Structure formats: C-alpha cells, structure tokens
Amino acid sequence: MDEKAYNFFDLAEIKARFPDRAESMIVDAYLSDHESASSRLFRLYHPIPRHLHETCDEHLVLLDGEVDFAIADEPPRRLRAGQMVTFLRNIVHGIQPVEGGAPAVFFTVDTPRRAPGDVHFVDSAESKGRRFVTHLASYEARSA
C-alpha cells in the first residue's frame, strides 16, 4: 500500500477485478491501512453469519446489490445500493445476500484499523468451515 498522504482510486476498476466466484465469504481490496483507520472494497459471495468485532467500529456503504442486514436483536433490514449502516465495536451483525440480485459490493471503513483476526462468530458452526476473507492482489493507488 502506498504510504502517501493522499490517494485516488477507481472503484469501478477494482470491482471489475473481483472474481465471479469465491470459496471465502468475501473478497476484499484494501484502499488504506493505517493504525487510525482502514478502508476496503469488498464483494459478498456467501452469507456472513452473525459476528462482532472487538477492536473497531464499522462504517459500511452498499455500492451495488441488495442484502438483508441483521444487527443487534433487530429483525434483518433490507439494504439497497446507496444505503449505509454504521455501528460500534461489539455489536453483533450478519449479512445475507439477496438471491438472484446483483452481486453485493461494499465500501467499508474500520476505525481504528480492524486486526485480521478480529472476526468473532456468535456460532462458529454457522461459518461451516468457510474462510471469512480472501484478499484481492494488492491494488496500487493511482493519482489522477
């Protein structure tokens, strides 16, 4: 990742690089990765069971597709492209893709940076042994 004080990204180009299929729940591409915050683009391939993050707050913008988003004890809420959800650390949440819809792609910011192992499933059996994330090959920031 380029350590400049600023970067420009072509999100459409990054989205086009996501594979059609993946064994992991998501495939992501880091846009920034600093102690104070990290930002990523990720595509959802399989349901993400209810889980939490102990070390970071999360800010998610759904760029494409539709998902059913479960949070805390509320019934799942349908999110559509252009909608955003934010929540603090230790809030249980899960994401279910909508069958037959466009692939769900999110822009996310974690504050502070989420440690790689900070994904704690409420019921580990629900993950069915599926890996949480696969990283897209490093994306080089390009200045405009």
Write out the residue ranges for each language-model feature.
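Short strand-connecting beta-turns/loops that link adjacent beta-strands
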Residues: 35-36, 74, 100-102
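Structural motif
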Residues: 38, 59, 66-68, 92, ...
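Short, conserved beta-strand element in jelly-roll/cupin
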Residues: 43-45, 53-69, 109-112
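Surface-exposed, flexible loop/turn segments at secondary-structure boundaries
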Residues: 49, 67, 75, 93, ...
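Short acidic-glycine-tyrosine-enriched beta hairpin
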Residues: 73-89
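Ligand-binding loop in jelly-roll beta-barrel domains
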Residues: 89-119
